[in-house]
Amino acid sequence: MIASDGLGIAGVDEVGRGCLFGPVFAAAVVLSDHAAEHLQAAGLTDSKALTPSRRAALVPLIEAHAHAWGLGQSSARAVDRDGIRSATEQAMLCALQRLPCRPQLVLVDGVLPLRLWEGSQRTIVRGDSSHAAIAAASVLAKEARDALIRRLSNRFPGYGLERHAGYGTAQHRAALLACGPTPLHRHSFLRKLFATV
C-alpha cells in the first residue's frame, strides 16, 4: 500500500543523455502532496521549459521542501563502455539508492523502464511536465550537471562548454574538428558524427 500523502513515491529523471561531452546525471525526488502543490505554485515544471534563472531559483526550494532527494551520475567513460541506456539507468539507480528510504513506487520519465530497479515502477511519457516529483528531479539533475560542466569548461577551454553544456551544437562540432576530443568526450557518440574522430 502506497502512502496517501505521496511520500512513498519517487520521481526520477535524467539530463545530458544526448550530450557529446561529460556525464549523464539523474535525480530522484520524493515530495509530499503539500510540497508538490507549493512547488508547482512557485513555478515548478519541466526543467527544459524554465529559464536558467528560474531553474536556479527553484533548486533551494526543492531541496527545502522535498521529503528526500538524491543525485547520481555516470561518466562519459561509462557511456562509452556500457552504452547510453545502461549508463543512464546506473545514474538513476544511484540517485534512488541515495534516498534515505526505498520508495514504494518509482515514476520514471519517458518510455523505458529501469531494468535494474526491482521494485514497483511506472514510466510516464512527458512525466516531467505532469508530475511534480519528476519535474523536481529534472530541475535538480539539470542544475547539478550544468554546474559541473561550467567548472569543467575552465579545464577544457575552447569548446564553448559553458554555453552549450556539452550538447552537439554547431560551435561544439566545429571545436571538435579543430581541437579533437577531450578525455571527457563520449567517443562512442563522436564516431557516429565524425568518421575521422
From Swiss-Prot:
A divalent metal cation binds at D13, E14, D109. The keyword Cytoplasm applies. Signal peptide: none annotated. One of its GO terms (molecular function) is RNA-DNA hybrid ribonuclease activity. GO terms for cellular component: cytoplasm; ribonuclease H2 complex. Its EC number is 3.1.26.4. Its cofactor is Mn(2+); Mg(2+). One of its GO terms (biological process) is DNA replication, removal of RNA primer. Transmembrane segments: none annotated. It is an enzyme of class 3 (hydrolase). Its main location: cytoplasm. Manganese or magnesium. Binds 1 divalent metal ion per monomer in the absence of substrate. May bind a second metal ion after substrate binding. Residues 7-197 form the RNase H type-2 domain. CDD domains: RNase_HII_bacteria_HII_like. It is found in: Cytoplasm. It catalyses: Endonucleolytic cleavage to 5'-phosphomonoester. Keywords: Cytoplasm, Endonuclease, Hydrolase, Manganese, Metal-binding, Nuclease. Belongs to the RNase HII family. Endonuclease that specifically degrades the RNA of RNA-DNA hybrids. HAMAP family: RNase_HII_B (MF_00052_B). This is Ribonuclease HII.
